[in-house]
Amino acid sequence: MIQQKFPATAKCFYVIDNFTKNLNQDFILSVSNEEEALQLYKQALFFSSNDNIYYFPSYDTIPYDHTSPNANIVSRRAETLTKLITNSKGKLLITHAANLLNKLPPKDFFSKYFLKLYPKIKFTMDELSMLLVENSFTRNTSSIDVGEFAVRGEIIDIILPGPKGYRINFSWDYIESIKEFDINTQISTKYCAELVISPANEIVLNSETIGNFKNNYLRNFGVNHTDNPLYEAVISGRKFAGYEQLLPLFYYSCSSLVDYLNNPICIFDNLSKQAILEFENSYNDFYLARSKANKLKVNNFYPTLSPTSLYFTASAITELLEQKNNILISYENSEQASLIGNISSISFIEKKTIFDKLFEIIKANFHKKIIICSSVLSSFERIKSIIQNYEYTFNEINKLDEAKASVINIGIIPLNQSFYTKEYLFITSSELLEEKTLYTNTNKKLKNILLELDNLKEGEFVVHKDHGIGQFLKLEAFKIQGKLHDFLKILYFGNDKLYVPVENIEVIKKYGSDNAELNKLGSVAWNKSKAKLKNRIKEISLHLIQIAAKRKLNISTPIELDLEAYDKFCANFPFSETEDQLTAINDIREDLTNGMLMDRLICGDVGFGKTEVAMRAVFMVAKSLNEYLPQVAVVVPTTILCSQHFSRFIERFKGFGLNIKQLSSVISSKEANIIRLELASGKINIIIGTHALLHKNTKFFNLKLLIIDEEQHFGVSQKEFLKSLKSSTHVLAMSATPIPRTLQMSMTGLKELSIIATPPLNRLEVRTSVMPFDPVIIRDALLREHFRGGRSFYVAPRIKDMEDIEKQLKQIVPELSYKIAHGKMTPSKIDEVMSEFYVGKFDILISTTIIESGIDIAEANTMIIHKADTLGLSQLYQLRGRIGRGKIRGYAYLTVASNKKITSHSLRRLEIIQNSCSLGSGFTIASHDADLRGFGNLIGEEQSGQIKEVGTELYQEMLEEQIALLKDDPIVLEQAFIPNINLGLSVFIPDSYVSDSALKIGLYRRIGNLSNEMEVEKFKDEMIDRFGLLPIEFNNLLDIVKIKLLCFKLNIENLDSGDDGFVIRFYKNADMTDKILKFVSRYSNQTKIKPNNKLVFIKKLVDKNIITEVNQLLWTLLEI
């Protein structure tokens, strides 16, 4: 065994140097934690131009887990194993040391199952579909997640690790093209010369592996377990949650990760050896815990393999590592001679002269290749600006071999600490700018978030503008003049049916509730209700506009920023701002400096950086140059959140000379009185408070900015007090799930809206399960969290439920400790319990919903919610947001009583929360909340009843129209009619093109929202890109939509065609006399004027020319 020493920060550089000098040799670099493995992999891609560098990730589940790992991780592991076995050249593999213990499929397995595709190769869609299913890919209606594929027309879309989307276009029996596409937008981005597809899982379900599973299952567990759902799923060729824990049963033998390389040299340190031993202890503990849990329930369908069946022993792996050719590394910070010569760390200590020190070092080392390594784009840009100010030349690089001498090279490289060698000097921006955690790129933009809301399901209540509330039954095709046409079938009172052509789908709106009374077709009751509500909406709209106008009339002195101090404050931010954060900050800056009062809502998920955005706003105002003693008030709903914000503000604003105080129930009456006096005199710059701040005795000296955090938690009287402040104060509201009233005002443009939808780097979605209470699953969940070193929340809706929960926990997990917190305890006692939970003095916090705001504990990542059906949608969402806030996956279990019948309303809430798992879905939740409860009375606070008359979507539309009317904005005004067009053509989306009914309805709804010809053409391009060439029936539909847009312009209410020409009927209130007379004069031999605003145009027509003919007719009418 060879031993080497060098600075820890140079580990990857050292490994790459070895790898580069021995290109035919395989290497494994094993490290002690997953984060380091991924970072070293990214560094290696920079340091080396060799493509044979691979990363093998660890599962994000625990040993003997009943849940499956993240699909991206599973696919990435399989992809890496495939590349290792199919690539004969020298390779470098980077991984967590514990992965060396994994038993993996035999090493020859992946060489049989990978696919290499390229344009012009002979391959049919059916052949590829069958092979993908056999390779553990899941066929779906649309491909969104890793390991999924979708068949659409002549196209197969597939999602591979990254995640990256690929679109394979077929022509008969060969592949025509392969393109990469954006998973969010589904739009192609570039062509690919070839595509290698590895199995999507380490377990491939085919006749051979299923046969092995049957035999090995019988050998290990003695019986077939034909009533076992896991067993039944596997022998049927279906995946089952957690079946990865039985991997050895699927193969005749297993290999280790080392076996996948050719006599590799293993590079490791003592921490790696320790990680191997710790993992062995961990999986042995989990085995004992799982065995104990299995005894609690008869016929548990997760049989438990022994540790030696699932893993290699630590002693065997350690012995392998210590063989003579392997390298044990240790670290020193002083200069060391090594294979790469003189490596040493650089330390920047004098922070006040950091950049002067930097350029002294650069001057002394200008004979070397100097590389400044930035972690993210924002710091990269900052460093670039600084270099320019010092008048140095710089060179932007992506790989080390692009570096030049006699210039400063800069690149985005994840390096932690500076170091130098004989040839290179590496300097990190993290030391220069004191950066810490990074953020990833934008995950979902506003457009995508809003598109998620646009769904319509069979059986849902809908509203027709003219006929009222009905129930959408299904899409149904009928023949009209011998041609198929898609219609929406709507059920009305008395079993009456209404069929709406899909090109007029915009007249159908979602009702937004599970409870509704069907209207009767032909009844005048609907129009009376609609007219009555329209008058009330007019009153509301007028009032809202007056409020908004009053605020705009209150001219505010533009805030003059202290730019030098503000730049310093921004530079102290320990993260890199996300794109959405920067957009929100710029929005606020514009609001504060434009001379009008700000009224803005920031909607962003928990942990997505709303607080920092608010702090920027606070700084802009509190340090403004043109205000005398400006004050900022931050209002929060709970004492816990108040304390948390106060601590963060004190730390963040340190050194800027601002006096910050908090006012809540933990503050004594005497101290509170002093704070109020200081507020009134202007001595306090920033006050953070709960409802204690909303007191009639609270007076401000010069309140310029009011920030309302978690605004959905404030009650009527509290908001009345806030209203009294708002008419002369800038207002910024923040929420993950805004109350429907605030959301409505934002969506109608009366309140400005900024959305932060960018998750932190490596944030994983919280896995959410809705289930009857099951003690075995609860025990498993709590022990899983305990054994991975974390803590758990157990939430009770009511204090009286806590006694039962305590009894259950004593029986289920007697080995774990717990404490209780609820609102009837004194604030000091709650603080004491919370402080102990923060530092990990006990395992489980049993609490009421008081934790839904203000709790941020990275180690607490499991939550059980008792009687979840009794909680509101936004409450459930906020509670779930307490977990999974770091880089560890969170697990939420929403339990319901097994013997209780759940109402359809409650069930809908639970379905929404379970399905809204994507990061940044708070806006979606708020909109669903509006669907369920209604936007309510926008002037007062009642959130029920009024919207019931017409439903959410139509109410929203009527309000927008009324506001537009009052503001003389004609853009969104309601059309007085909807053109009906009958050209005798087949009009529908064929099942062969889009087979999924829900997706098809979503596309129809999008078509209903197209408002001009350019939008139609863009939509058409998107469809061709996603699904292939348009079938004639779909093309007819889009052509008719364009014709319909022309009909709006010409006030044509009906357009019918026959063999001998067209019949046009104009809208009764439209004055088209001049146009008609001019047209008749020009085409006197072909036209006739009929009663009831009808115009007949005579011309022999054939199907293939009818679209062209009608377009010529309408454009002629338009241009006359």
UniProtKB/Swiss-Prot annotation:
Gene Ontology BP terms: regulation of DNA-templated transcription; transcription-coupled nucleotide-excision repair, DNA damage recognition
Protein name, UniProt field: Transcription-repair-coupling factor
Location within or outside the cell: Cytoplasm
Motif annotated as DEEQ box, chain positions: 709-712
EC number: 3.6.4.-
Any one Gene Ontology molecular-function term assigned to this protein's record: damaged DNA binding
InterPro entries from the UniProt entry: CarD-like/TRCF_RID, CarD-like/TRCF_RID_sf, DEAD/DEAH_box_helicase_dom, Helicase_ATP-bd, Helicase_C-like, Mfd, P-loop_NTPase, RecG/Mfd
Broad class of where this protein is predominantly found: cytoplasm
NCBIfam families noted in UniProt: mfd
Source taxon at top rank: Bacteria
Binding site for ATP: 604-611
Name of one Pfam family that matches: TRCF
Signal peptide (from-to): none
Helicase C-terminal domain ranges (all copies): 777-933
UniProt KW Lipid metabolism keyword: no
Species whose genome carries this gene: Rickettsia prowazekii (strain Madrid E)
UniProt GO cellular component terms: cytoplasm
Record key words, sorted: ATP-binding, Cytoplasm, DNA damage, DNA repair, DNA-binding, Helicase, Hydrolase, Nucleotide-binding
Chain's role: Couples transcription and DNA repair by recognizing RNA polymerase (RNAP) stalled at DNA lesions. Mediates ATP-dependent release of RNAP and its truncated transcript from the DNA, and recruitment of nucleotide excision repair machinery to the damaged site.
Top EC class, one word: hydrolase
Family label: In the N-terminal section; belongs to the UvrB family. In the C-terminal section; belongs to the helicase family. RecG subfamily.
